[in-house]
C-alpha cells in the first residue's frame, strides 16, 4: 500500500534579505505542491525584507544562535571546561588563519542546540556561503537525507573551499 503522507523538507537559511538566494527560495516555495510536501523554513532571524513573501503554507521557525564569546563564557559557568577549551582552540585557529569560516562552523556545530525531535525526510542548507547555515543543516537538524544548494559561483569565496570539502 502506498504511503500518502506528505514528505517533510526543511530549508535552512540565515535571513530573508533581498538577494538572489532568497528570491530563488521564494520562487521554489511557491512552486511546491503542498499536498505532497510539508515544508519548514529555519531562519536565524525572521526580520528580513523578503520575509512577508514566504508562502503562508510554510512553517517558519527560528534557530537559536549566540556569539562565540558568550558561548565560551556559558561553557565555563557550566563547568564544561573541555567545550570551553575547544572554543578557545578554534578561536585561536581562526585568528591564526585569518579565517572566520572555521570559527563560525565550529560554533554552529558545538553551540547551537538541536532544534527538536522532528526528523525530516530531507534537510537543505540553502546558503552555501554561510558556514553556520551549512553546519546547522548538517549537524543540528535531524534528517534522513542532507543537501547543499549552491547558488552562484563557488569560486567567489575561496576561503570556503576547504570547509566545503569536509561536508
Regions found by a protein language model. Give the residues of each.
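Histidine-centered beta-alpha loop that forms part of the nucleotide-sugar donor binding/catalytic region
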Residues: 14, 127-128, 150-153
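An aromatic- and histidine-rich active-site surface loop
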Residues: 100-115, 123-143
Amino acid at each position: 500500500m502506498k504511503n500518502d503522507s506528505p514528505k517533510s523538507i526543511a530549508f535552512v537559511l540565515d535571513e530573508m534579505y533581498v538577494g538572489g538566494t532568497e528570491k530563488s527560495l521564494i520562487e521554489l516555495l511557491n512552486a511546491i505542491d503542498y499536498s505532497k510536501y510539508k515544508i519548514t523554513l529555519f531562519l536565524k532571524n525572521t526580520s528580513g525584507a523578503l520575509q512577508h513573501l514566504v508562502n503562508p503554507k510554510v512553517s517558519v521557525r527560528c534557530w537559536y544562535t549566540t556569539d562565540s564569546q558568550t558561548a565560551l563564557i556559558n561553557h565555563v559557568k557550566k563547568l564544561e571546561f573541555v567545550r570551553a577549551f575547544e572554543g578557545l582552540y578554534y578561536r585561536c585557529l581562526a585568528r591564526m588563519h585569518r579565517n572566520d569560516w572555521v570559527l563560525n562552523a565550529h560554533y554552529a556545530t558545538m553551540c547551537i542546540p538541536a532544534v527538536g525531535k522532528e526528523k525530516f525526510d530531507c534537510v537543505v542548507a540553502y546558503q552555501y556561503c554561510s558556514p553556520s547555515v551549512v553546519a546547522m543543516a548538517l549537524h543540528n537538524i535531524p534528517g534522513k537525507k542532507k543537501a547543499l544548494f549552491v547558488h552562484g559561483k563557488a569560486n567567489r569565496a575561496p576561503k570556503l573551499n576547504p570547509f566545503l570539502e569536509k561536508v
